Design a protein with these regions (language model features):
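N-terminal, charge-rich interaction modules
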Residues: 35-39, 46-50, 55-57
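Single conserved position on a long alpha-helix in the C-terminal lobe of the eukaryotic protein kinase
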Residues: 46, 82-186, 252-255, 302, ...
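Ser/Thr/Pro/Gly-rich low-complexity linker/stalk segments immediately outside membranes or between
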Residues: 25-43
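An internal, short helix-loop-strand segment that often contains or flanks glycine-aspartate motifs
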Residues: 53-89, 132-246, 262, 275-282, ...
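C-terminal functional regions that serve as terminal interaction/effector modules
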Residues: 27-28, 50-52, 254-357
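Short, conserved charged micro-motifs
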Residues: 55-57, 117-123, 259-266
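N-terminal Sec-pathway targeting helices
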Residues: 1-16
């Protein structure tokens, strides 16, 4: 009888421990990435996981032979190359407010995770800094960059935080959250409210409130690439993501304040989409690019009550070209051969080729 009771208590203890582990795993799974949880309050959050991107592309494999001298010196002194050694990055975007005689300035706070030598990086930052401020056992490097102040802190092995906001409170808060081991549900309120809607497996995503027209510097490409940002309702929320499956699935949910607002945005997006599909897409090598064409042909827009959803399926080959070749060129679709008009006989010159640069 005593043996049975002992086994019963063992079984209960195992069940409790297993339940705790499962709960912790589920909480961790539904929580945003560690780097995001360190970020301060902001108007937009952008996250990218570069590790899987390197598997699908040549990023970091064919490093450029010629680079900016200042960046080359950074690499020489630190041994860190962003293309090769940066694994994950999270950005908080602060739009700023315009004041009398002063334009609104966008500021950024970021957390970078990768492989770097803390001693070498620390020595490099110390050379650039005008002073080093201690805070809770961490060194904050104060670095002047143009007319702003950049604060950088090395938080631990392979992780750094930086911010160019006016107040030091931002970087202090990032350090404090790191010291608390980045609890699962801390971080920007935008992320707490909307991260659950980011598709599982997304390696690039953003959650943002679009800026008011003329309220801050242009930074819309972090929200929805390709020029769509100018259409976004300023009182809405955008959740955009990219995740790799058979191809890269792109999705952007635009949440508006009303069905009428969603309908208006969809109508604008439909016009914009029709324009995109009328363009001819080519690489510098000349001729239509089928991967680019397939990506834009897959673009779809549909409305769900107060929301508008934009989706696209992009071939992996497209991203390989983007990261290894010259930029994609956009231009009006070339007229069919039967519709082309011959140049006047008296001109004495050949008709220009619209694909030539």
């Amino acid at each position: 009888m005593r043996i049975r009771k002992n086994w019963l208590w063992v079984a209960v203890a195992v069940a409790v421990i297993a339940g705790g582990i499962v709960t912790a795993v589920l909480l961790r799974k539904s929580a945003p990435p560690d780097a995001v949880r360190l970020l301060p309050e902001s108007d937009a959050v952008f996250y990218v996981n570069l590790a899987p991107i390197r598997l699908f592309t040549d990023l970091g494999k064919n490093l450029p032979k010629e680079r900016d001298p200042q960046y080359e010196e950074f690499v020489r002194q630190t041994g860190f190359e962003f293309e090769r050694d940066l694994d994950r990055a999270a950005f908080a975007i602060h739009y700023g407010v315009a004041s009398t005689g002063k334009q609104a300035e966008t500021r950024y706070s970021e957390v970078l995770q990768g492989r770097f030598d803390s001693t070498r990086v620390g020595n490099y930052l110390r050379k650039l800094a005008t002073r080093v401020e201690p805070y809770q056992g961490y060194d904050i490097y104060i670095i002047p960059v143009e007319d702003r102040t950049l604060r950088v802190a090395l938080l631990g092995v392979g992780i750094a935080a930086a911010s160019n906001t006016d107040s030091a409170d931002i970087i202090h808060g990032m350090i404090d959250r790191y010291r608390r081991a980045a609890l699962p549900f801390v971080g920007p309120s935008l992320v707490s409210q909307y991260y659950r809607r980011v598709p599982l497996g997304s390696i690039v995503w953003t959650i943002a409130r679009p800026p008011a027209a003329g309220g801050a510097e242009d930074h819309g490409e972090l929200l929805v690439p390709g020029g769509w940002s100018g259409l976004l309702p300023p009182d809405g929320v955008v959740i955009a993501s990219a995740r790799p499956l058979n191809e890269v699935r792109l999705r952007a949910d635009v949440i508006t304040q009303s069905e009428a607002g969603a309908q208006k945005f969809k109508q604008q997006a439909d016009v914009y989409l029709a324009l995109f599909k009328s363009l001819e897409f080519s690489m510098d090598t000349g001729g239509p690019d089928q991967d680019v064409k397939a990506a834009f042909d897959s673009l779809e827009v549909h409305q769900e009550k107060q929301e508008v959803v934009l989706t696209a399926k992009v071939p992996y080959a497209f991203f390989k070209k983007v990261l290894s070749e010259p930029p994609v060129e956009f231009g009006p679709a070339a007229p069919k051969s039967g519709d082309q008009q011959a140049p006047p006989a008296s001109s004495g010159a050949k008709a220009p080729n619209p694909k030539q640069r």
